[in-house]
Swiss-Prot record:
GO terms for biological process: cell division; chromosome segregation; meiosis I; meiotic centromeric cohesion protection in anaphase I; meiotic spindle assembly checkpoint signaling; mitotic spindle assembly checkpoint signaling; protein localization to kinetochore. Belongs to the protein kinase superfamily. Ser/Thr protein kinase family. Residues 39-93, 114-209 are annotated as: Disordered. This is Serine/threonine-protein kinase mph1. The active site is at residue 442. GO terms for cellular component: cytosol; kinetochore; nucleus.
Length: 678
């Protein structure tokens, strides 16, 4: 750094001192600036200042209306610094237009070039000047260590000759100390302090402008860093907006709100504390449903104590009613031990007679006897309380029964595969009962439960075992369903007993009649006598003069014919028609048995290529055109059959035999295989 006195940047302060002379301004010669020279008590320059002190080619007086911010920016050591912390030339603070400033050129320069040294010291002076700009006490701004001798540059007394507005004074004096008597450090320090002191001499009007403009700068508590030796401090995230978007002037309310916003502490969102029993809530979850159990307990306990039921020392929890009938209720229950669902049948027989009570107990005995079969509902636990008159049975839980399934599909065309599958499962269930010499005597769609896609027989309330020496059972009453009741169950076919009580004779054929009524409903959508009233049905069922109608086309319920031949019906095949007619024979001796129904062609349909050929003329060699194809009736072995098949395939490839003849030969081969002993 070259040894020189501090530069003079404020001509208004320069001319206010009467001690100013040409010798005192000799320090300007050290600048060695060819563009700057002294002439007629004024400074002339080919450049102009950005603070309004020099415009054009003449250095003019700075008006008292200039703001302290403008004079601060005009200082050569702060020229390249943005007061918001940005060192660019695009700062909005350089474009302050006041009445004392009128730009005459497109570019502006300072009188004194920016020194290359003491940069860090200038930063301290600038920071101090910005932070203490609004102070009204000049005495408090002077440091105590400053030399207060009259010859000192930093505290030289300024005397003003004339008044502002009357033109420039004729002469001004400024007393300077001898540069040789002061060290470089002292001169630099005093120069900075002098610039700092001069920047504070502003009018009251400019005080308000500077305070309003520079107050947001108080958010930055760290001094400006421009030296490469000192790293730049980190900014608070809230200061980024003000750093990149400096504002010169704004309303006082905006200033106050901005100050409150930056001074407000940052609130970090914390999830509210939740107790252990409080359920977790989320907007994406379904609506709240009252929990079935109390989660705070180790063992699930229902909300209502009356929902707990104990059967055979096993606890269950009621979930809802499945069905009801007469004096019985069926519930869906839950077992906490294995987390499975069951069905609970509760029967109240407090007002029932002994015959009814014995029938309920007989059902438990039959279920235990038939337990383990896949076609019979499983009984897990049961108990009878004669004191309370209550019977409880825990059984296998199903999805629905056959009655609901048929009602759901009654308006749709029948599906023969659907009928064939469930008809076979019903026959197998009844076969299990008959093999144990038991007659169910109350078969109906509601007594077949659908469990995991398979039908199972339930409700043995009126079932009774058959004696070993008889084929029928005798009951003193029958409480089955009328639409599925056999004719013999409605006819007094037995003599009076010694006690005068009429007996009803029932056997296995009565269950076959009931099965025939169920099959009829599966095909046509209703039972054979369901369209009649009860009195009419009771009279029509045993009456042989009343013919049961078997349509050849099965129509869905409530089918409407839009045009001729457009009904959505399904043709009933001859095998299905034969099964229904053979099951609904009024003479029970003519009805098919369960084993015969299981091997009926309806359940064992032959492929189309194995069905008997229609009687039509076929061109076969050695026969007339009106003759039927030759049927092979001789018994053959398996090897011979294999040779015939191979020969037939070979001939068919050469198109020597037609398809009808090959089918006929294959049918005869299969027929002969059936006749061969196993």
């Amino acid at each position: 750094m070259s040894k020189r006195n501090p530069p003079v940047t404020n001509i208004a302060d320069l001319v206010s001192d009467s001690s100013l002379d040409e010798d005192s301004l000799s320090f300007l010669e050290e600048l060695q600036d060819p563009e700057l020279y002294f002439k007629n008590d004024t400074f002339s320059s080919k450049s102009s200042h950005s603070d309004g002190t020099v415009t054009g080619d003449t250095l003019r007086r700075q008006s008292s209306g200039a703001t302290a911010l403008e004079r601060l920016v005009s200082h050569p050591r702060t020229k390249n610094f943005d007061l918001q912390g940005n060192g660019g030339q695009n700062s909005a603070l350089k474009e302050v237009n006041t009445p004392a400033y009128q730009s005459m050129h497109h570019f502006e320069h300072l009188i004194t070039p920016l020194p290359s040294t003491n940069a860090s010291h200038s930063e301290v002076s600038l920071s101090a000047g910005v932070n203490d700009l609004n102070s009204n006490s000049e005495h408090d701004l002077l440091p105590k260590s400053v030399n207060k001798t009259p010859g000192s540059l930093s505290i030289s007394r300024r005397r003003r000759i004339g008044r502002i507005g009357l033109g420039p004074p004729k002469r001004a004096e400024y007393t300077l100390t001898d540069p040789s008597k002061t060290s470089d450090t002292k001169n630099s320090t005093e120069a900075d302090e002098d610039i700092e002191m001069k920047s504070r001499e502003v009018s009251p009007a400019s005080n308000s402008v500077a305070a309003t403009t520079l107050k947001p700068l108080q958010l930055h508590n760290t001094p400006l860093q421009t030296s490469q030796e000192h790293p730049k401090p980190s900014f608070h995230p809230s200061q980024f907006e003000s750093s990149f978007s400096p504002r010169v002037q704004f309303d006082h309310d905006v200033e106050r709100r901005a100050s409150e916003l930056h001074s407000r502490p940052v609130t970090v969102f914390q999830e509210p504390q939740r107790s252990a029993s409080q359920p977790y809530e989320s907007h994406a979850l379904s609506p709240k449903v009252a929990p079935l159990f109390d989660n705070s307990q180790a063992t699930p306990i229902p909300k209502r104590q009356q929902d707990v039921v104990t059967v055979a020392n096993l606890q269950f929890i009621k979930l809802g009613v499945v069905g009801k009938g007469g004096s019985s209720m069926v519930y869906r229950i839950f077992s906490p031990d294995n987390s499975r669902l069951y069905a609970l049948k509760e029967v109240n027989f407090i007002n029932a007679d002994q015959t009814t009570i014995q029938g309920y107990k007989n059902e438990i005995a039959l279920l235990r006897k038939l337990s383990g079969n896949d076609r019979i509902i499983k009984l897990y636990a049961a108990e009878v309380n004669d004191t309370l008159g209550q019977l409880n049975m825990v059984m296998e839980c199903g999805e629905t029964d056959l009655a609901n399934l048929l009602m759901k599909n009654m308006k749709k065309p029948i599906n023969l595969n659907f009928i064939r599958m469930y008809w076979e499962q019903m026959l197998e269930a009844v076969q299990v009962v008959h093999d144990q010499n038991i007659v169910h005597s109350d078969l109906k769609p509601a007594n077949f439960l659908l469990v995991e896609g398979n039908l199972k027989l339930i409700d043995f309330g009126i079932a009774k075992a058959i004696g070993n020496d008889t084929t029928n059972i005798h009951r003193d009453s029958h409480i089955g369903t009328i639409n599925y009741m056999a004719p013999e169950a409605l006819t007094d076919m037995n003599a009076h007993t010694n006690s005068g009580v009429k007996l009803v004779k029932l056997g296995r054929p009565s269950d076959v009649w009931s099965l025939g009524c169920i099959l009829y409903q599966m095909v046509y959508g209703r039972a054979p006598f369901a369209h009649l009233k009860m009195i009419q049905a009771i009279a029509a069922i045993p009456n042989e003069q009343y013919h049961i109608h078997f349509p050849e086309v099965a129509l869905p319920a409530n089918a409407v014919q839009e045009k001729e031949g457009s009904l959505p019906g399904v043709t009933v095949g001859p095998d299905l028609m034969d099964v229904m007619k053979r099951c609904l024979e009024r003479d029970q001796r003519k009805r098919l048995t369960i084993p015969e129904l299981l091997v009926h062609p309806f359940l064992n349909p032959l492929p189309s290529y194995l069905t008997p050929l229609a009687k039509k003329p076929l061109p076969v060699s050695g026969h007339t055109n009106n003759a039927h194809p030759l049927r092979l009736s001789t018994e053959i072995s398996a090897s011979q059959l294999s040779m015939i098949i191979e020969r037939s395939v070979e001939l068919s490839k050469h198109k020597r035999l037609n398809k009808e003849l090959i089918d006929s030969m294959a049918y005869d081969c299969v027929s002969n295989l059936r006749k061969m002993p196993e």
